[in-house]
């Protein structure tokens, strides 16, 4: 299954969670903040399977990953001696596109993915254009000099502070430590995702 590229506001309403992490989907003045569809404003009780599937889909949308990518990440997390769900989130947070977003070079993960895809960043002097690339702690990512005047980057840097596990200086950032569970998404129930794949 491919990565979802459609409108995210509708998906955010479906999940009752800001996929873009801006809460614009639920801001005052928006006509519809409930789930889409004819009966969107009615609560639907999900089955046990439905709850697990629901959480998995939410994780895919938040991080912008495909089913194949999420399953691969889960299998890698299972091999760890640490808590599988926490490691799963840490691996997703360690993706290059996510770190570009966390460092404040983009206002959304989609925007960050686009910047990476277009080759605006380098690692050790080499082009880094694979969004799913797993970045090791201690790695420094640099925005190319020719990309530093991009309006969307300049606006993002003014608006977005870097996350606690990323240090940003000028046009580069360093992924200096893995985030703790308490620092990551509080609205994601990663245990349900782990249980979904474990069945």
From Swiss-Prot:
GO CC terms: small ribosomal subunit
InterPro entries for the chain: Ribosomal_uS4, Ribosomal_uS4_bac-type, Ribosomal_uS4_CS, Ribosomal_uS4_N, S4_RNA-bd, S4_RNA-bd_sf
Domain (S4 RNA-binding) ranges: 94-157
Membrane-traversing stretches: none
Keywords annotated in UniProt: Ribonucleoprotein, Ribosomal protein, RNA-binding, rRNA-binding
Gene3D superfamilies tied to this protein: Ribosomal Protein S4 Delta 41, Chain A, domain 1 (1.10.1050.10), RNA-binding S4 domain (3.10.290.10)
Protein origin, superkingdom: Bacteria
Keyword Ribonucleoprotein among UniProt keywords: yes
GO BP terms in the entry: ribosomal small subunit biogenesis; translation
GO molecular function: rRNA binding; structural constituent of ribosome
Quaternary structure, from the entry: Part of the 30S ribosomal subunit. Contacts protein S5. The interaction surface between S4 and S5 is involved in control of translational fidelity.
Similarity remark: Belongs to the universal ribosomal protein uS4 family.
Database matches in HAMAP family: Ribosomal_uS4_B
Function: One of the primary rRNA binding proteins, it binds directly to 16S rRNA where it nucleates assembly of the body of the 30S subunit.
Protein name: Small ribosomal subunit protein uS4
Gene from which this protein is expressed: rpsD
């Amino acid at each position: 299954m491919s990565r979802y590229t459609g409108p995210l506001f509708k998906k955010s309403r479906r999940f009752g969670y800001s996929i873009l992490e801006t809460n614009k989907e639920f801001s005052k003045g928006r006509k519809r903040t409930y789930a889409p569809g004819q009966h969107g404003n009615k609560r639907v009780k999900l089955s046990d399977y439905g709850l697990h599937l629901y959480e998995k889909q939410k994780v895919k949308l938040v991080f912008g990953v495909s089913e194949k990518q999420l399953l691969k990440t889960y299998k890698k997390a299972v091999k760890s001696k640490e808590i599988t769900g926490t490691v799963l989130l840490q691996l997703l947070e360690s993706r290059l596109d996510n770190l570009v977003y966390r460092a404040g070079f983009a206002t959304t993960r989609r925007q960050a993915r686009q910047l990476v895809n277009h080759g605006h960043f380098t690692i050790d002097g080499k082009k880094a254009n694979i969004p799913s690339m797993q970045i090791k702690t201690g790695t420094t990512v640099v925005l190319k000099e020719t990309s530093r005047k991009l309006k969307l980057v300049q606006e993002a840097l003014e608006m977005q502070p870097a996350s606690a596990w990323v240090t940003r200086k000028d046009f580069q950032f360093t992924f200096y430590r893995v985030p703790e569970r308490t620092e990551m998404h509080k609205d994601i129930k990663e245990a349900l995702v782990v249980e979904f794949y474990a069945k």
